[in-house]
Structure formats: structure tokens, C-alpha cells
């Protein structure tokens, strides 16, 4: 591992096969945690390449638990996180809106690493526990058209890496790899990164992984979500073609707003924000969710344009369908918890 650390520290990019070897060493319990941390920090300082990201994703997926589900049009809207904007959990809220609009959502997520509340933290604050077995995870997907995969449960080899990431306390290559390692076979994906210079490379990684259609966003102000604060950079992956474009909130009929208007807090505070949105409280939080969910519906082929997607997302909330999805998942979680106690 030290030889890879030294090479990356002097700015050397690793070839795909070399990164395969380095990735396997990271997951090897015999490798010193300090060496893994040094490698992750060196990669971050150098700047990760598409080959390095794709290689680590391949190794992680090979170690993940196998999930048997029918090959339907499953979608994930998990972002990379780690943008430092301290906003509420936009993609988690958007997942319920997407499901309310008819998308089949298999959302990958984790606890907080470099934010105040990760996806799993806010789900628990909403009343949804994240310790479902794999069978329960699939049952929820089949029953409600939405499920949440807590990364450590489906990537058991990530336990030690997770502890190292917590110690580092800032984004690493694992943030980039997270959205790429959902064990459920995906047809479409909407994901965000906070590196506008890397959107095209990230889209090429998704193409290598076999996505038929996907949208990658690098949001205004350095967000890993579509932002109301200005121009957002996108790449659309459609049947092998990579198409860059840009968009503002004004372009789809939404009001612009600074990032400070959508600041979040801890898990409990973010859960309250999400419930307020689903109860139809309009404002920047609401607009941010329908903006992102609308893009997701366009990515999933349910809307012909992003503006049409925003209208569908708005209807998902105002009709009560998004809240119904949330309540249904909470009820499922409560039922599973009661069974566990009874045992």
C-alpha cells in the first residue's frame, strides 16, 4: 500500500488495473488503517480520475451482497455528498417525491461523514429505521416502489473503511464511488457531484457501468444537487451519448434563492423541513426539492422536459402522494420493528 501512497503523493495517476490492486489492498484487513487513510488523502489532494473511480466501484460492487430483484426500471438519486453546503437532505426528500410520481426508487445512502446529517440519519428521524435485512429491503421496494439501502448493510467490507472515513472527516474518493455501487441493478440514475470539472468524466464512468440513461449535476455554489442559486452544469447520458447542458431555476419557472435559504441542521431539524415540504409549505426548500425531483423524472423518462418534470414533482407533493409514500415507509418500518421485538 505504501508504494501506491508514494506514487499518488507525487501526483501520479493510477491505471485501471493498478487501482484494482490498490482497492483490494484497502479492503484487506492486514493493511494498516493509517496507510489506507494516507492513500485516500493523497488521492483527494491529487484529484481522482475516471479510471480510479471506476476501478474502485468495480471492486466494491464485487464485494457487495447480491440482490435478486426483477430487472425493472429502478432508479437511484443518491448524490456524492461532501459539498460542505450544510443544506437539508435534498435527495432523500426528492426520493419520496419521485416515488409519489410513479418512479421505482432504490436509494443508496449512509450516515453522516462530513455533514450534520446523512440520509440514514434523517430517515431515522422521520421514523424509518435503516437496519432492514436484505429481504425486508426488497419487500419494501416491491410493496411501495421505494426502498433505502444503508451502505454498511449491503457493503459489509466497508465497516473498517467507514471508521477511517469518519476519522478523516472530509470527502474522499468513496463519496464519488458511493452512487456507483448500488447492488440493485439500475436502469436510470440522477446523481450530483460538487466538481464541475468532473461531470463529463463521471458520466463516462456511469456509461462504463451500463447505465442506459442518467443525469449528472454539479450545482451552483458548489452543491452536489441542482441549486436555486445560479447556473447548474449537467451531463445527460442517453444511449451512450454524453450531452452537456446548463440550467437555472428561472429556466423551469422556479424562483432563484441563495444557498443560505436552504440551510439544514441536525437530523431532527432536517426531518421537520421535509415534513413541512410534504405538507405543501412553499418556499426555497420546496422549490429545491421539486427542481431536483423534476430533473429525476426527466432522467427516468417520465417527463419529456425538465419543466414538465418539475410540474409532475409539484403535483406529487400537493396531491399528497409524496407524503403518502413517506407514511407508508414509516408504517412498514414500524411493522418490521414490532416483529423484531416480538421475536
Region spans (language model):
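N-terminal basic/disordered segments at the start of proteins
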Residues: 1-13, 77-83
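Glycine-rich anion-binding loops and their surrounding alpha/beta cores
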Residues: 7, 62-65, 87, 102, ...
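Beta-strand segments within the central parallel beta-sheet cores of soluble alpha/beta enzyme folds
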Residues: 54-57, 72, 136-140, 217, ...
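Active-site cofactor/substrate anionic-group-binding motifs, chiefly glycine-
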Residues: 47-113
Amino acid at each position: 500500500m505504501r508504494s501506491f501512497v508514494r506514487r499518488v503523493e507525487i501526483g501520479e495517476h493510477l491505471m485501471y488495473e493498478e487501482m484494482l490492486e490498490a482497492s483490494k489492498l484497502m479492503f484487506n484487513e492486514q493493511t494498516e488503517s493509517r496507510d489506507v487513510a494516507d492513500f485516500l488523502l493523497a488521492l483527494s489532494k491529487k484529484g481522482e480520475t475516471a479510471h480510479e473511480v471506476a476501478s474502485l466501484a468495480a471492486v466494491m460492487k464485487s464485494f457487495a451482497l447480491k440482490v435478486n430483484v426483477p430487472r425493472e426500471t429502478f432508479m437511484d438519486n443518491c448524490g456524492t455528498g461532501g459539498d460542505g453546503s450544510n443544506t437539508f437532505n435534498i435527495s432523500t426528500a426528492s426520493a419520496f417525491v419521485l416515488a409519489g410520481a410513479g418512479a421505482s426508487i432504490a436509494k443508496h445512502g449512509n450516515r453522516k461523514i462530513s455533514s450534520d446529517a446523512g440520509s440514514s440519519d434523517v430517515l431515522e428521524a422521520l421514523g424509518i429505521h435503516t437496519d432492514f435485512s436484505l429481504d425486508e429491503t426488497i419487500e419494501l421496494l416491491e410493496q411501495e416502489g421505494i426502498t433505502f439501502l444503508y451502505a454498511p448493510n449491503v457493503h459489509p467490507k466497508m465497516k473498517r473503511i467507514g471508521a477511517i472515513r469518519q476519522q478523516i472527516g472530509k470527502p474522499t474518493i468513496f463519496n464519488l464511488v458511493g452512487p456507483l455501487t448500488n447492488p440493485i441493478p439500475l436502469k436510470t440514475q440522477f446523481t450530483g457531484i460538487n466538481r464541475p470539472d468532473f461531470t463529463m468524466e463521471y458520466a463516462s464512468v456511469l456509461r462504463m457501468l451500463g447505465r442506459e440513461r442518467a443525469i449528472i449535476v454539479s450545482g451552483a455554489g458548489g452543491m452536489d444537487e441542482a441549486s436555486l442559486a445560479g447556473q447548474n452544469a449537467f451531463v445527460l447520458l442517453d444511449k451512450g451519448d454524453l450531452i452537456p447542458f446548463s440550467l437555472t431555476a428561472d429556466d423551469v419557472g422556479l424562483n432563484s434563492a441563495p444557498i443560505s435559504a436552504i440551510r439544514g441542521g441536525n437530523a431532527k431539524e432536517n426531518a421537520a423541513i421535509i415534513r413541512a415540504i410534504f405538507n405543501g409549505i412553499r418556499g426555497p426548500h420546496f422549490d429545491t426539492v421539486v427542481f431536483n425531483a423534476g430533473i429525476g423524472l426527466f432522467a427516468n423518462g417520465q417527463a419529456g422536459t425538465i419543466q414538465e418534470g418539475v410540474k409532475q414533482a409539484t403535483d406529487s407533493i400537493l396531491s399528497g402522494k409524496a407524503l403518502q409514500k413517506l407514511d407508508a415507509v414509516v408504517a412498514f418500518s414500524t411493522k418490521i420493528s414490532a416483529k423484531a421485538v416480538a421475536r
